[in-house]
Amino acid sequence: MTLQGNTVTPHDLPDVINNFLFDISESIPPVDGKFLNDLRSSLVESPPSFVVSEYAVYRALSRIKTSSVPGPDLLSSRLLSHLSDIFAAPLCSIINLSIRQGIVSWQWKLSRVTPVPKCNPVQRLEDDIRPISITPCLAKIAESFMSSYFNDHFNDFIDDNQFGSTKGRSTTLALIKFSHDLFVASDNSANIIRVLFIDFSKAFDLIDHNKLMHKMIQNNFPPHITAWSISFLENRNQFVRIGNTVSSAIGLNAGCPQGTLSGPNNFKLFINDLTFSLPYIKYVDDTTVASISNDPCDPALQQALDDLCSWCAVNSMKINVNKTKEMVIYFGRRFQLSNIPMLKAINDASVARVNCFKLLGVHFSADLNWKQHVDFMLDKVAKRIYYIYLLTRAGVNSNHVVEVYCSIIRSVLEYASPVWHPGLTKTQSKSIECIQKRCLRVIFPDLNYKEALFVSGLLRLSERREISARDLFNQIKRPDHTLHYLLTPRISPATAELNKDKLRSCYPFEIPRAKTSRLNKSFIAYCLTNRF
C-alpha cells in the first residue's frame, strides 16, 4: 500500500498513518487558550439541569456492553459493569467537577486509533481508510451526559435539512425527502434536474476548534457545555495501533475524533450554517444539492457550488473534487446533455458527471429506475447465501439459521425499502423475493415456499415492504413529524377539528395528479394515491 505515492512497510504503517493524520490539520491553529480560560473563569456553579445524579451514573455503568474493547487506559468494561455500584459515586463526583470547571483530564482525551478499511484491499492510505478513535470507557460515559445536554439545546435550531445522528430522523427519511423532490420535478418533462453530490475531504479532521467554540457561543450554548466540549477536543493525543504494532503518541491541533459520541454532534453544529436556497439534504458530512430549471444554462447550481467553496475557505474545510459528482436527470427531447455546462469547482476543476450515484447506501440513477440498486442488493446478498448452506449442513437448528438469514441477508434487502419499493417493477420485486425463497429452500428442503413461510414465521418480502411503507407513512401523517410538510391538507386543521365526525370517511390530504408514471414512484405520492 502507498501514501502519497510512497510505499509503506507494515512495520512503519502505524507511525506513517499517525503522522499523516497530524499533517492534515497541522496548519490549523490550536485553541485560543486565553479565550477558553476566560470562558472557564466565568463559569458559576453548575445549573441543576447540568448536575449528573449518582443513580444516572450507576445506570450508565451497568449498561456498558461487557464485550466492548477496552480503551487506551485498558480499563475493563466488564469490571466497570459488574462493579457499577462501587464506581458510581466517585465517577459521579468526577463528572460533575469536570462539568463545573469546564476541564476534561488528559487521560480521558487520549485515544487509540484503529484504521478501518473503506475497501479491500487498501491501496492508497489517504483515501482508503477511516480512522476510528477508541476512547476510555469512562470518557464515553461522561460524553453521553454531555451529548444529551448538547442536543437538548441544539435541537431548537438545527437545520431542518440535517438528518444525521438526530432523534426522529434517519437515512430513510433523508432519502424520502430527496427522492420526492426528484420525482415531483421529473413529472414535468421540461425540467432539467441537476444533482450535486458533495464530498468533503477529511471533514472530521479539519474542524477548527476556535471556529467551533465561537459557533457554540454565537448559538447561545450554555457556557458549561461550550467549555467542556472544547476542553474534550483541545490538546488531545492519539496513537495508532495495527495488530501488535503501536505508533508513538502525537498531539492534534484540530479535528473531532470519529467513533466518539460528540464527534457527529460537533460536526453537525460546525456545518449548521451551511445552507442553500436550492433543495438539499445533509446527513452529517454527506451533503446533496439539486437545482430544477427548464434552462440548461441556469447558473443556480454553479452559484451554490461557488457559495460552498467560499464557505469552505472561511471554515478551513476542503472539497474533494475527485469524489464530488454531478448527475443530470432530464426526460425531455429539447436539449442534449452536451448543452448543459459542466460545473466548475476550485481552480476551475470540472466536477465529473455520472449516470448513477450511491447516496446513503441507495443507488440513484439518472433514469430514476431502481435497476442499479436492485442489482447491487442481489449481488451483495448472493455472496452471503453460502453461509446459510454451511449452517444448515452443520446441523444448526433451523430457527437459528432463520435468525442468521434475517440478520445478514433480509436486512440488506430491506434497507431503506420505503424509498425504492414504490418504483419496483414486477420483475425486480420477483427477483428480490427469489432470494428469500432460495434461502428457505435450503433451510426447509422438504417444504414449499408457502409452508416454509408458515413454519419460519416469516412474511413475503413484498408484504413486509408494504407494511413498512404504511407504518412509516402513518408516522409522517403526524403534524409534528419532520416530513409532514410534504403532505397538503384538503381542509384547514381548524375546519377539520370542527367537523371531525363528518369527515372520518374523507381522506385528509390532497392526492397528487401525476402527468407521468414517474411521480407514483415517489414514496409520498405512492402512499397518498393508495390512501394509506
Predicted feature residues:
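Surface-exposed loop/turn segments and immediately adjacent short secondary-structure elements
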Residues: 1-126, 133, 137-141, 158, ...
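Short, charged alpha-helical motifs in flexible N/C-terminal segments and linkers
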Residues: 1-19, 50-95, 100-107, 113, ...
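Catalytic palm active-site di-aspartate
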Residues: 71, 110-113, 130, 162-166, ...
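Active-site palm subdomain of RNA-directed nucleic acid polymerases
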Residues: 146-163, 185-187, 264-290
